[in-house]
């Protein structure tokens, strides 16, 4: 949402503030959708909320970890929109690829580690 607000305001996201480097913005503006009905999307979309994690790929795969001690689950949303069939054991390479991409995203966006949590 921040990228959209900055775009609508005609502003630019700063690289520094008071001499301090600012973490680059990771999002993309939704303004092109409002203007043209189309926008180039991300290859992946990740989120975390109270230790529940999810990572969606442009090709329809979704990686889910429903809690800190839970195992990663993998779903093919093209064939299973209601996420009834966990395919993590059937497609371990795809799961591992997406876990690696999630971890890279989480580190880049400073999603993890949480304050007070030890780094892995």
Please identify what each model-predicted range represents.
Residues 99-100, 110-114:
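Short amphipathic alpha-helical segments at helix boundaries and their inter-helical linkers
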Residues 114-120:
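Short, charged, surface-exposed hinge/linker loops at domain edges
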Residues 80:
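Intrinsically disordered, low-complexity polar regions and short flexible loop motifs
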Residues 91, 95-102, 106:
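Short amphipathic alpha-helical coiled-coil/interface segments
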Residues 63-65, 86-89:
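Short amphipathic beta-strand/extended segments with alternating polar/hydrophobic composition
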Residues 24, 88-92:
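Short, conserved loop/turn and helix-capping segments at secondary-structure boundaries
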Residues 2-77, 108-112:
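C-terminal cap/loop subdomain of S1 sulfatases and analogous C-terminal strand-loop tails that border
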């Amino acid at each position: 949402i921040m990228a959209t607000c900055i775009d609508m305001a005609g502003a630019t996201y700063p690289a520094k503030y008071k001499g301090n480097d600012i973490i680059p913005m990771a999002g993309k503006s939704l303004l092109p959708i409002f203007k043209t009905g189309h926008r180039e999307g991300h290859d992946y979309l990740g989120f975390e909320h109270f230790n529940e994690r999810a990572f969606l790929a442009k090709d329809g795969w979704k990686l889910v970890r429903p809690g800190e001690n839970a195992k990663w689950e993998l779903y093919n949303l093209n064939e299973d929109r209601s996420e009834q069939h966990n395919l993590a054991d059937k497609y371990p390479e795809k799961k591992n690829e997406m876990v690696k991409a999630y971890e890279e995203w989480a580190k880049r966006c400073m999603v993890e580690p949480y304050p007070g949590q030890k780094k892995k």
